[in-house]
């Protein structure tokens, strides 16, 4: 693996997608081979799994089913899109990766971070990011952003009660502590221009 694998993590409404859309042209202008993608999704099979995971009417989905679907989508996305790009020396910017599963299914769903980590180690063959940016934000602020975003489709996870979203953030903070060697926490409750500037500086200082 020759390229650089950067993942952007955070609770709902933290600004991950908007951030990546801004990072992509910045690094392209620097003559960097760069690719943006997302989880679950990024390729046809994983996008189909994403549709299942996000369907509002699938409220009966059991936690283990959810965890395994995310891991399956991750595996296919990794081997079909991410690894080939890394082998061609790309900077890959990915909206979510393993840490999402640890926070959402491992902690918030109560399945256990160690169990979810082992499932995903198998799915990814121990492929881990070069760097992870965690966008930290209070759940109330993130969910309020979602409500104001008319262009964003509300998914099944958005519909969870506030206690779930608080557990997600708690889970993320534990993940940040556990993997402090590769995860940098950034305050997402700031103007997007400042957030972009801060994240660009982190990526350039640590990787480029």
Curated annotation (Swiss-Prot):
Q: Which InterPro entries match?
A: P-loop_NTPase, Thymidylate_kin-like_dom, Thymidylate_kin_CS, Thymidylate_kinase
Query: What keywords sit in the KW lines?
Result: ATP-binding, Kinase, Nucleotide biosynthesis, Nucleotide-binding, Transferase
Assigned EC number: 2.7.4.9
Q: Which reaction does it catalyse?
A: dTMP + ATP = dTDP + ADP
BP terms from Gene Ontology: dTDP biosynthetic process; dTTP biosynthetic process; dUDP biosynthetic process
Gene Ontology CC annotations of this record:
cytoplasm; cytosol
Q: Which residues bind ATP?
A: 10-17
| Gene Ontology terms, MF aspect | ATP binding; dTMP kinase activity
- Domain of life of the source: Bacteria
> Which Pfam families does its entry note?
Thymidylate_kin
Q: What does this protein do?
A: Phosphorylation of dTMP to form dTDP in both de novo and salvage pathways of dTTP synthesis.
Q: What does the sequence similarity comment in the record state about its family?
A: Belongs to the thymidylate kinase family.
Q: Mind telling me which NCBIfam families this protein's record contains?
A: DTMP_kinase
Protein name (database record) = Thymidylate kinase
């Amino acid at each position: 693996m020759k390229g650089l694998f950067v993942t952007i993590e955070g609770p709902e409404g933290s600004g991950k997608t908007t951030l990546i859309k801004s990072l992509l042209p910045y690094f392209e202008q620097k003559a960097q081979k760069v690719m943006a993608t997302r989880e679950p999704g990024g390729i046809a099979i994983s996008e189909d799994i994403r549709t299942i995971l996000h369907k509002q009417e699938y409220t009966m989905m059991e936690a283990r089913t959810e965890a395994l679907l995310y891991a399956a989508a991750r595996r296919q996305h990794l081997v079909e899109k991410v690894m080939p790009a890394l082998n061609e020396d790309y900077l890959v910017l990915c909206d979510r990766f393993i840490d999402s599963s640890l926070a959402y299914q491992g902690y918030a769903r109560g399945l256990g971070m160690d169990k979810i980590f082992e499932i995903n180690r198998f799915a990814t063959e121990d492929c881990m990011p070069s760097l992870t940016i965690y966008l930290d934000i209070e759940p109330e602020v993130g969910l309020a952003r979602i409500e104001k975003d008319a262009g964003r489709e509300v998914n099944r996870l958005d519909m969870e009660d506030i206690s779930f979203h608080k557990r997600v953030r708690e889970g993320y903070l534990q993940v940040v502590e556990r993997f402090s060697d590769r995860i940098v926490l950034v305050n997402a409750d700031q103007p997007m221009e400042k957030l972009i500037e801060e994240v660009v500086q982190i990526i350039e200082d640590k990787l480029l």
